[in-house]
Amino acid sequence: MKKIYQWAVGQSFKKLDPRQQVKNPVMFVVYLGALITTILCFYPMGIPLWFNISITIFLWLTLLFANFAEAVAEGRGKAQADSLKQAKKEVMTYKINSLEDIKEENFIELQSSDLKRNDLVYVRAGEQIPADGDVIEGAASVDESAITGESAPVIRESGGDRSAVTGGTTVVSDYLVIRVTSENGQSFLDKMIAMVEGTQRKKTPNEIGLQIFLITLTIIFLTVSITLVPFTDFSSQLSGKGEALSLVIVIALLICLAPTTIGALISSIGIAGMSRLTKENVIAMSGRAIEAAGDVDVLLLDKTGTITLGNRRASDFLPVHGVSEEQLADAAQLSSLADETAEGRSIVILAKERFNLREREFQQSEVKFIDFSAKTRMSGIDYRGDVIRKGAADTMKKYVQSKGEDYPSECDKIVDKIARAGGTPLVVIKNNRVMGVVYLKDIVKNGVKEKFADMRKMGIKTIMITGDNPLTAAAIAAEAGVDDFLAEATPENKMNLIREYQEKGHLVAMTGDGTNDAPALAQADVAMAMNTGTQAAKEAGNMIDLDSSPTKLLQVVQIGKQLLMTRGALTTFSIANDIAKYFAVIPVLFYSIYPQLDRLNIMGLGSPLTAILSAVIYNAVVIVALIPLALKGVRYQEKPASQILSHNLLIYGLGGIIAPFIFIKIIDLILSLIIL
């Protein structure tokens, strides 16, 4: 952090370049004012030189403090970008012309920067993946810690939704043949570095709108200030008292009344918001996406991995009439001994825990394991003349009936009961006889129900997306506490649901990782793609989660809302400050011409010169005081918007009015003692 501050100090002076200053119109007015007062130091025009120099110094400090706030925010991003740049380095790689060329004598050795889109490269264990691409052959463990920070390697393989690889990651085992999907300089890592450094950061619509508002206020105060010189000159001549305000005092008054506090911090608030998101290992492709996350009022959440743990577990054995629970458990365990899925392992463990049934040792000749296939939709075992199978209820019903056996209606009732409870029924048969049903339960993650309740308080509607049947979906939705659900979801009805809410004026957020998610991701206002997902999903999203955790969407929404809350709170504080400074300073400046105004000098400020200088000093110092808040953000509160508004008006509105009166008075007392 020390290095960031040192770098930021240097940048504060570099940013005094007028080409940089003109990008922020409010602070550019301060810049012009500082230049004019600097020139006037050589031509005092009846104003004490100490006053002129003091005003000039604190106007320049106001600019430097504003530059420092922005530079610190940029410095954090730069530090993150530097760590990413270490992953992006030139490496030698092996290009091949086709999959048939996977022989060392056919390898073409070249630099990674020379690769073109659609080139095929061969990457072995220990070698760095040279560019973004899709795996078209092979399966390997890949170390993605350079990108995600996660030390555990992940599996990347051809086909499916885990085929995308990122340049800069390292193959740990086996080999991969990769088709390059990006040109040099346009990789995912390049985009990450550009976004984190802020080189591609554009002002968001909200920022532009706020800046227009601040410029309008500044123009109003500028117009008022310009008229003060002739007005006070005329008034002093008419009343025969006092004298016209000097140009230095008018400039100082303008800077005090203009919304310089929020003008100084507006850029750093936006940059810090993106930095907070990056710390959560989420890369936003634009600041607009973060702001949209703050305004989101509909969340589409995948059931698996977001609401539930993702692995269903066996929780009960429910036998049909004439079969004991232990007999069902024995058959279910036998049928699952070769099943390496989480569900299969949980059946073996539950049977062991309930009835002390241990895994058997078999002779190869007496056992035949039947693996699950998409065609048969069942798995099982042939063991010592017994044929044991387990599978989905509808599949097993057809299987039993095809063998000419009766399928008990009792089993249908058990299946229906499990589905209504939100579980998945797995029917077990032995020698064409139905033994009963294994109850596989989706385990809802701890704390999600409370999280969804908080979202509801904030006016955010949560919708669970699942491929389960409506009965199962309804039960899990009730247990998790979501507001609605979409069962038997397809890419088409996901996209239609998003459009339906958008047409009603809602902003919708969702996550996705597969090619089939791409259309819905492209349609959503906030679309967070998983880093483990396909290239199509990443390109359709406007955010990428490097940890590939769908639950992260909730944190993204919180960060977006925190950014908007911070900007709103500091804008409220800044404008309240301006109002307070107006009533604190104006009576003192004019009471020499209009003695009656002395009654409004409720603070008892010493003189016009110390009053205006105190206001200028306060104006500069308050920027420094608010830098930590701008960078960290206001405390996030899971409350309705109306309550948050009331809270911010009380804290930042009332606080913004009281603070100037207190601190300007203290500074004025100190100045009065020094001058005396």
UniProtKB/Swiss-Prot annotation:
Q: Where is the protein situated, by its record's location annotation? A: Cell membrane
Q: Does the keyword Nucleotide-binding apply?
A: yes
Q: Which Gene3D superfamilies match?
A: Calcium-transporting ATPase, cytoplasmic domain N, Calcium-transporting ATPase, cytoplasmic transduction domain A, HAD superfamily/HAD-like
Q: RNA-binding as a keyword?
A: no
Q: How does it sit in the membrane?
A: Multi-pass membrane protein
Among the Pfam families in the record, one is Hydrolase
Q: Which SUPFAM superfamilies match?
A: Calcium ATPase, transduction domain A, Calcium ATPase, transmembrane domain M, HAD-like
GO CC, sorted alphabetically, is: plasma membrane
Please describe the quaternary structure of this protein.
The system is composed of three essential subunits: KdpA, KdpB and KdpC.
- Name of protein: Potassium-transporting ATPase ATP-binding subunit
Which organism does this sequence originate in?
A: Enterococcus faecalis (strain ATCC 700802 / V583)
Q: Which gene encodes it?
A: kdpB
